[in-house]
Amino acid sequence: MGSTSQEILKSFCFNTDWDYAVFWQLNHRGSRMVLTLEDAYYDHHGTNMHGAHDPLGLAVAKMSYHVYSLGEGIVGQVAVSGEHQWVFPENYNNCNSAFEFHNVWESQISAGIKTILVVAVGPCGVVQLGSLCKVNEDVNFVNHIRHLFLALRDPLADHAANLRQCNMNNSLCLPKMPSEGLHAEAFPDCSGEVDKAMDVEESNILTQYKTRRSDSMPYNTPSSCLVMEKAAQVVGGREVVQGSTCGSYSGVTFGFPVDLVGAKHENQVGTNIIRDAPHVGMTSGCKDSRDLDPNLHLYMKNHVLNDTSTSALAIEAERLITSQSYPRLDSTFQATSRTDKESSYHNEVFQLSENQGNKYIKETERMLGRNCESSQFDALISSGYTFAGSELLEALGSAFKQTNTGQEELLKSEHGSTMRPTDDMSHSQLTFDPGPENLLDAVVANVCQRDGNARDDMMSSRSVQSLLTNMELAEPSGQKKHNIVNPINSAMNQPPMAEVDTQQNSSDICGAFSSIGFSSTYPSSSSDQFQTSLDIPKKNKKRAKPGESSRPRPRDRQLIQDRIKELRELVPNGSKCSIDSLLERTIKHMLFLQNVTKHAEKLSKSANEKMQQKETGMQGSSCAVEVGGHLQVSSIIVENLNKQGMVLIEMLCEECGHFLEIANVIRSLDLVILRGFTETQGEKTWICFVTESQNSKVMQRMDILWSLVQIFQPKANEKG
């Protein structure tokens, strides 16, 4: 974190009772996490001593050598628990922390430290503060420390922590004034300034909101706070919304996220903020909040100014407004489009401009026009009309066509005329934007795969009938009012062409098909081409490259790789060899280790037998030879130690460079070297080997002797 954390630590000791501040940072050391001293600040100006005569300065300097593991000492325990701890050494008698006081904090206590505060700052680490005087416990100061380090790591996370803390501390930042007094007349001629302020902050706030936004983001977002803060500064010098000590307007919940309200254009910052405003007691669309709904007004009057949980307030407000306002959406905005006085929404705190009101009207007109288009498209599909080039009805089969009986009454107006689509009416005019766009593909594909042939009307009709039955059971019973509007002229100022009350029947089920995303935009005109289009994604399926696998490695294979890695470390020279040679070397190594204990027992027995032979004067059979030249004489002795095939080979040489050559010769004779050593005797070297024949094979001593003579004979001839 660098110099920024140094400045934060310095701020803790500036004009306060704290004399030093230390930041312990979490770091990886091998396979474990440790706490090491990252930054420290010591206020040496408060003391008269300097340098080597300052015991507290030396104590702070010694802290840089300490390393805490997680759970070790008070610092490690605080890092694990995530809490804070106030330590007063004069009355602290916890035996579990005796090591901490006698070894780590002994120099600090001897320097006069009377209060130590240890605070966990999330994933950053731990902050430790010390004071020469006794400091009373203060939870607000602890929260202040955490907020500063959270802001240093992630400013947005610190803002969310501020919001939660404000809600917990009952610091609701709304002013305590009655809602009836918040009328637009209290702030005259300020709407233009508010609009300018919102437009200036729009681009910066949108950038911050889109880049820092996540699904778990709290409702009171920083972008809303910044806009309302700017607006509050402009409104005639009177700040209606006041900030709390936890942050800039952190206690005010400005409503729900844009996605929950259903807004499709996030660039309308002013519109979204004003739309969110009613959820905290500021109403829009009428002069008085009592005009909305008596239940909503009563709830706001009793709870808004007293409730300490802004999240509960927002949820309750959303429930009331959704249940009371949305059913009257058609009539409200139709009346709004016919009058000029009601075209702009009057807010009790901020009076919106006419442009922002028009944004509301256009957005609602677009949403209602989409619903009208979808209802008309449902009616056309239910009447059995087939578009030119469409294969929706062909794919669904004859069962879908049979549901058209008696449905043409839905298209009849009050004068008895039936509306039919014109030839020049395009598909896009009768198709709305679906939510799940590929639902039709999935339904038809399932029908085709289950039956094996999309053109089999009998099997297809059964699947469609079962699907229709399920939808009919899920659809609530009752009456519906269908507003049939011309999709070409779907403006809000035109009255609906027909309003027909119908019972819940198969036309509503057809409407359910259309509402969940069915559309007739396929360009092909036959069922064969439709089936071919469904098979195209199967052919374009990518194959994995050789050596690559999308599936995770099985656990047993991972264990095998780990064991091979351990073998490479244990077996000599096994780090760079192949797996086959590694296994071969491992087998030889294990066989050698298996015979170690057996060889040790044999060596001890042979040594005891040799001592007994020397005491009794008995000599074992031996064979000796001297290989000599002009300047060199070498003695070789081959002796049987016992009847188990153990052979003692002794040589006296003038050079010690023959040891490895002799060992290779012995191994070539299928003898196992149990023991081998050299010893210097004057100017010569004595070499001794204790060997054993493999597989109980009887080895003649002359064979061993002759093989060893071949080593010395050529060298003696060369020097001769």
Curated annotation (Swiss-Prot):
Ranges of biased composition (kind: Basic and acidic residues): 545-558
Tree of life domain: Eukaryota
Region (Disordered): 522-558
Keyword Transcription regulation: yes
A single Gene Ontology CC term: nucleus
GO terms, biological process: regulation of DNA-templated transcription; root development
GO molecular function, one term: DNA-binding transcription factor activity
Location in the cell: Nucleus
UniProt feature, compositional bias: Polar residues: 522-534
Keywords: Developmental protein, DNA-binding, Nucleus, Transcription, Transcription regulation
Short motif Nuclear localization signal, span: 540-547
Domain bHLH, chain residue ranges per copy: 544-593
SUPFAM superfamilies assigned: HLH, helix-loop-helix DNA-binding domain
Function: Transcription factor that may regulate root development.
Homology family: Belongs to the bHLH protein family. LHW subfamily.
Protein name: Transcription factor bHLH155
Name of the gene: BHLH155
